[in-house]
């Protein structure tokens, strides 16, 4: 009979849930950073910056996420060790799976956030920017007073979608032995031979994260539009 504590493994799923949320939040922060840099690059007047941003988004969106995770976790340390060996140094490099997971997921979804921010920047009315220039606003002041407040408002729906996909993608880092929700469910399923029970429980946890995220996103969007609605 399935008990409420999931045969003694309920604590493991809750711990895995906490780790999944931590990885998701860290990766989202990194994705926003990469996204802002990528959007700046795509909209830059410098050809090199545009080329780097285009290359980044094309490569990341063209390579399967699982391959990128394995490449970062297993490939990067091996590459560093080989380079050190060729220079005559005996070096051992081990990546922390938690750090590797955040870095890789953040890098991947930064490419998608790049397009979100690019569209948000372009959605800011040009007339307002030209009016700010006519009033003698400097670039920094115009960015802070005119562009960024509106850009974030336009970007919020897209960033919410990025978060929804990102948090589910954290399940992929179970392949690098990080005991997040998916890995914890797999361990419990193998130990008890009850795969349906634990994978179904994990799916409910993911669904719960999604529902809570949708509620929070809706409230943030409503708050961000208060000024526009009053205007």
Where are these regions (language model features)?
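Transmembrane alpha-helices and adjacent helix-loop boundaries
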Residues: 1-231
């Amino acid at each position: 009979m399935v008990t409420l504590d999931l045969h003694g493994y309920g604590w493991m799923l809750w711990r895995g849930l906490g780790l999944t949320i931590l990885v998701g939040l860290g990766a989202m922060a990194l994705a926003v950073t990469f996204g802002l840099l990528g959007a700046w690059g795509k909209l830059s007047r410098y050809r090199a910056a545009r080329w780097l941003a285009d290359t980044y988004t094309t490569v990341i969106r063209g390579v399967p996420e699982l391959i990128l995770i394995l490449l970062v976790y297993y490939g990067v340390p091996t590459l560093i060790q080989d380079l050190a060996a060729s220079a005559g140094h005996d070096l051992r490099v081990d990546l922390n799976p938690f750090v590797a997971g955040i870095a890789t997921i953040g890098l991947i979804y930064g490419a998608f956030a790049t397009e979100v921010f690019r569209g948000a920047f372009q959605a800011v009315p040009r007339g307002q920017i030209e009016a700010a220039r006519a009033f003698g606003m400097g670039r920094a002041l115009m960015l802070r007073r005119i562009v960024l407040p509106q850009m974030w408002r336009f970007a919020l729906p897209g960033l919410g979608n990025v978060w929804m996909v990102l948090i589910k993608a954290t399940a992929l880092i179970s392949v690098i032995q990080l005991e997040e929700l998916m890995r914890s469910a797999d361990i419990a399923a193998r130990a008890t031979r009850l795969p349906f029970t634990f994978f179904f429980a994990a799916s409910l946890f993911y669904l719960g994260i999604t529902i809570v995220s949708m509620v929070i996103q809706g409230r943030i969007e409503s708050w961000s539009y208060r000024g526009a609605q009053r205007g």
